[in-house]
């Protein structure tokens, strides 16, 4: 369960099966077990210390802070470990409870279906009179894409994640225990597991490599998604059969997966052509291993003795015998009367050949292979479609004999979704890399009188179009260029080699981060043409070029950029290679860091509207790629509500969303949670494509939002970019420097290693404010905007805001996110960071900045309460309200411990006794882990 989407016990509809008591019992159990472990590992005085710390922070007395200041480093670390494991255990119990609820919900009728489920959606649309043809139209173009990323603040070690899964399985065992003895056995095993966990280092000892991150991400596909996707499809088919039985024929492959892990090179020098090649080979090896196991199980199952098998199967077996005679010799006698088993043996052999070839390719890399070096396997699968054709043949032959086979249907579903690639790799690179590459190439070959980088935009466009239409190659086979330029060129050549060997699905998308102008896309098209990925002469191309607009200025300019591109005949030729579809990515993180939460949210909303208008005017299909993070400050929050809050007409059955590494465990670590997450995202896309998301007459509200956004942006930038001493304040009162020392990501936390706000990545920016409990990025500026508007005419303007909140999904979602964030802010803890960590020379400036933040927080809180008509934050969601209140009180000791350890670490003269820097750093890093577990998010 994600803290942002709490368990609603009442929603389960069964007061007996899933009561508060079952959740409470498991929480009490893990608390008791942790107390036992703490006593065993730290003695009775540690348990007493933990009780005192917890009690003192429930009522917010000063005793807790005084106690922390007296603790030795050794005792501090023990307390930190206990609180950190406690939060992780609570998270596990809540996640387990949510899984039980979803299992129970699956057995209910449409009357009690979970909101956001397929059953609930189709029942709702039936009551609203939505016609079958309208739903069919959406289903025919339904295209949901979920893209996994490696998160620079994915703080939990894979070793610890494995322990989490084991404890979940033990909770399952406890549910199934029938006797006291069985329950006691589970308790004993769980106690042992927690004790081993206590002695396991929670900190990464070495920075993970990119391929380590690849293996970590692929785990979710292997262990969960491979089985979850067929379940989601079968649930959609089941619900369509209930409400629109004729539409199951309209259902294609509606959900696919992508990944940036191993292919996102923006700001990560560790990702190069060879790494991306190895990533593709690793993904293929894992998906082939899954298929081989599935086919082996099918061969065990399909023991049908057929003296007269279907003619199509006989013809296929005769061809197989000619191609793979050794398989026939091995199995023809054993499976003499079992043609399905014999056919599956041929399929297994081809899969094994495919796997062997893949292993060979992984070793030899992406360089162009000469013919004599090619492996001698003739009978491997060149594409997943070949395997699918054989599986479809088996299904058809079985149907002619009146036999159905669910495992075969499941395997077909899996091959249709995951192919031989598992997840498509999106390559991402900063726009300046392509500019630098063409500048160097054109200078080396003397193609421009003026250096390319010095050309204005119009001159660039003219030169790029001319070069794209020139038949001669631009770049020589041998690369006499700098290492950076050579790597950029090799990336495109590697993509071409990947597509040739694996099919275009493996690497079909090239994202240009920090896109600002039309030439940014044409530069990539030119480099793609040089690698054989685009040919304007024949109108063929296999690489989709995707601009990523990130700052507010770039979001505002995006419609103009697309207008320019769509007006170019050469670019329209490129679009025909992709069924006239343009994908556009919008960045939530950098726009938020640039302009604050309200302005970022609103500018992304506007950009979608204006981009859609440009696309419609030019007859271009549009797919918007939402670069959402895991936290509110980076566009996070419940996906269902977020999709329904998009502007009318911008979804149209298609959406692409990033799933950040930090939320993968909460969404995809358990089968039921993964299946339901995919189901709700898909249901939301269907709903947003069929039903209007903006109320009639909302145009005036959009004008109002623009006014509020402008004020909020000015207020935010006055603090973050214009307030004297703010950067020093940020560096002092957050653990930003210590976060950069966590060995948790292959990617640096800053671009190019600079130490200014512009170079700091949005993710550690959010992570730092979350740790010190300000959560500044998710609300600052909103209060001034709302308060100023309300004060102009309180009765009229507040009534307007309340109407917007009740009737406009976008505004309601925005305010709800802020309300939840405000509940998480703990200004008392934040004030302690200021008190403990500001140097004397910064005290006056820092106190002024803190006063600005505190005043804005109070303004924001009062305005949100007035708009929602709540007396307290989250008054309409008691489970979430209670959960956050409890977590706030329990996280507080970790915040005080962190500030104290940071003080000792940074200021040697403030240490009560002499500690080594490494000891203090380790303690501080452990608090970062603990707070992240308690807050349930990082960046």
Curated annotation (Swiss-Prot):
Provide the protein name. Answer: Phosphoenolpyruvate carboxylase
- The superkingdom listed in its UniProt entry is Bacteria
User: Which Gene Ontology molecular-function terms are recorded?
Assistant: magnesium ion binding; phosphoenolpyruvate carboxylase activity
Instruction: Write out the GO biological process terms.
Output: carbon fixation; oxaloacetate metabolic process; tricarboxylic acid cycle
Protein family membership: Belongs to the PEPCase type 1 family.
Cofactor(s) of this protein: Mg(2+)
The family database entries (Gene3D superfamilies) matched by this protein are listed as: Phosphoenolpyruvate/pyruvate domain
Show the taxonomic lineage. Answer: Bacteria, Bacillati, Cyanobacteriota, Cyanophyceae, Gloeobacterales
Q: Does the keyword Magnesium apply?
A: yes
Assigned GO CC terms: cytosol
Q: What does this protein do?
A: Forms oxaloacetate, a four-carbon dicarboxylic acid source for the tricarboxylic acid cycle.
Q: Tell me its EC number(s), please.
A: 4.1.1.31
Cite the entry's keywords alphabetically.
Answer: Carbon dioxide fixation, Lyase, Magnesium
Catalytic reaction list: oxaloacetate + phosphate = phosphoenolpyruvate + hydrogencarbonate
Catalytic residues identified in the record: 151, 593
A Pfam match:
PEPcase
Q: Which NCBIfam families match?
A: PRK00009.1
> Which residue spans adopt a coiled-coil conformation according to this UniProt entry?
none
The answer, when asked if Acyltransferase is one of the entry's keywords, is: no
Species name for this entry?
Answer: Gloeobacter violaceus (strain ATCC 29082 / PCC 7421)
């Amino acid at each position: 369960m994600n803290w942002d989407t709490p368990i609603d016990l009442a929603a389960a509809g069964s007061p007996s099966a899933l009561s508060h008591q079952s959740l409470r019992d498991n929480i009490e159990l893990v608390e008791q077990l942790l107390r036992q472990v703490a006593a065993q590992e730290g003695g009775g005085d540690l348990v007493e210390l933990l009780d005192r710390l917890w009690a003192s922070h429930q009522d917010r007395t000063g005793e807790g802070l005084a106690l922390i200041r007296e603790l030795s480093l050794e005792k501090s670390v023990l307390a930190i470990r206990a609180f950190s494991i406690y939060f992780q255990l609570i998270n596990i119990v809540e996640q387990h409870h949510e899984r039980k609820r979803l299992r129970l919900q699956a057995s209910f009728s449409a009357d009690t279906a979970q909101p956001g489920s397929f059953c609930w959606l189709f029942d709702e649309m039936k009551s609203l009179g939505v016609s079958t043809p309208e739903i069919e139209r959406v289903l025919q173009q339904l295209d949901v894409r979920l893209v996994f990323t490696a998160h620079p603040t994915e703080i939990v070690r894979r070793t610890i994640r494995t322990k989490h899964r084991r404890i979940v399985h033990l909770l399952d065992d406890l549910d199934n225990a029938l006797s006291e003895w069985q329950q006691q056995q589970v308790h004993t095993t769980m106690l042992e597991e927690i004790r081993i966990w206590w002695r396991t280092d929670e900190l990464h000892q070495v920075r993970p490599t990119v391929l380590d991150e690849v293996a970590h991400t692929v785990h979710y596909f292997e262990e969960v998604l491979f089985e979850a996707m067929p379940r989601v499809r079968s649930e959609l088919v089941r619900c369509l059969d209930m409400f629109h039985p004729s539409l199951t024929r309209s259902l294609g492959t509606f959900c696919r997966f992508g990944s940036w892990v191993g292919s996102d090179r923006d700001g990560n020098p560790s990702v190069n052509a060879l790494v991306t090649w190895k990533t593709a080979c690793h993904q293929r090896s894992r998906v082939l291993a899954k298929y081989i196991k599935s086919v082996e199980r099918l061969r065990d199952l399909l023991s049908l003795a057929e003296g007269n098998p279907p003619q199509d199967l006989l013809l296929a077996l005769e061809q197989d015998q000619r191609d793979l005679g050794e398989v026939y010799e091995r199995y023809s006698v054993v499976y003499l009367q079992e043609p399905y088993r014999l056919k599956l043996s041929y399929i297994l052999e081809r899969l094994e050949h495919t796997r062997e070839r893949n292993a060979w390719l992984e070793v030899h890399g992406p360089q162009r292979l000469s013919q004599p070096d090619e492996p001698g396997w003739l009978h491997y699968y060149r594409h997943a479609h070949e395997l699918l054709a054989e599986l479809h043949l088996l299904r058809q032959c079985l149907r002619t004999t009146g036999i159905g086979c669910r495992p075969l249907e499941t395997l077909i579903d899996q091959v249709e979704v995951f192919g031989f690639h598992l997840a498509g790799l999106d390559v991402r690179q900063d726009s300046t890399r392509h500019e630098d590459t063409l500048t160097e190439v054109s200078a080396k070959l003397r193609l421009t009188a003026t250096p390319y980088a010095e050309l204005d935009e119009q001159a660039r466009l003219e030169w790029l179009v001319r070069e794209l239409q020139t038949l001669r190659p631009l770049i020589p086979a041998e690369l006499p260029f700098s290492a950076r330029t050579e790597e950029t060129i090799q990336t495109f050549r590697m993509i071409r080699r990947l597509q040739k060997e694996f099919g275009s699905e493996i690497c079909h998308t090239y994202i240009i981060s920090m896109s600002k102008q039309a030439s940014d896309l044409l530069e990539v098209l030119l480099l793609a043409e040089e690698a054989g990925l685009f040919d304007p002469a024949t109108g063929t191309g296999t690489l989709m070029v995707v601009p990523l607009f990130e700052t507010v200025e770039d979001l505002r300019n995006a419609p103009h950029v697309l207008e320019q591109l769509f007006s170019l005949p050469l670019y329209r030729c490129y679009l025909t290679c992709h069924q006239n579809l343009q994908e556009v990515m919008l960045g939530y993180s950098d726009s938020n860091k640039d302009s604050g939460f309200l302005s970022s949210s609103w500018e992304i909303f506007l950009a979608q509207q204006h981009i859609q208008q440009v696309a419609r005017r030019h007859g271009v299909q549009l797919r918007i790629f939402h670069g959402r993070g895991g936290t509110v400050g980076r566009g996070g929050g419940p996906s269902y509500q977020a999709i329904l809050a998009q502007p009318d007409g911008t979804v149209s059955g298609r959406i692409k969303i990033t799933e950040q590494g930090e939320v993968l465990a909460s969404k995809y670590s358990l089968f039921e949670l993964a299946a339901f997450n995919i189901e709700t995202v898909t249901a939301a896309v269907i709903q947003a494509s069929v039903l209007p998301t903006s109320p009639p007459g909302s145009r005036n509200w959009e004008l109002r939002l623009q006014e509020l956004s402008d004020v909020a942006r000015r207020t935010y930038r006055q603090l973050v970019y214009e307030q004297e001493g703010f950067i020093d304040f940020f560096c002092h009162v957050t653990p930003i420097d210590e976060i950069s020392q966590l060995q948790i990501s292959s990617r640096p936390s800053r671009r190019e290693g600079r130490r200014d706000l512009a170079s700091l990545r949005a993710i550690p920016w959010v992570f730092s404010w979350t740790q010190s409990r300000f959560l500044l990025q998710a609300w600052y500026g909103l209060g001034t905007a709302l308060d100023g508007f309300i004060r102009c005419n309180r009765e009229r303007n507040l009534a307007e805001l309340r109407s917007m909140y009740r009737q406009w999904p976008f505004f309601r979602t925005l305010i709800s996110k802020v309300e939840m964030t405000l509940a998480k802010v703990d200004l008392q803890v934040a004030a302690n960071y200021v008190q403990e960590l500001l140097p004397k020379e910064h005290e006056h400036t820092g106190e002024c900045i803190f006063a600005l933040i505190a005043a804005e927080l109070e303004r924001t809180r009062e305005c949100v309460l007035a708009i929602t008509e709540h007396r307290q934050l989250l008054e309409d969601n008691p489970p979430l309200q209670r959960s956050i209140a409890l977590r706030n009180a329990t996280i507080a000791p970790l915040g005080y411990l962190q500030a104290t350890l940071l003080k000792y670490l940074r200021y040697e003269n403030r240490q009560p006794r002499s500690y080594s820097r490494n000891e203090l750093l380790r303690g501080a890093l452990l608090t970062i882990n603990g707070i992240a577990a308690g807050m349930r998010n990082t960046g």
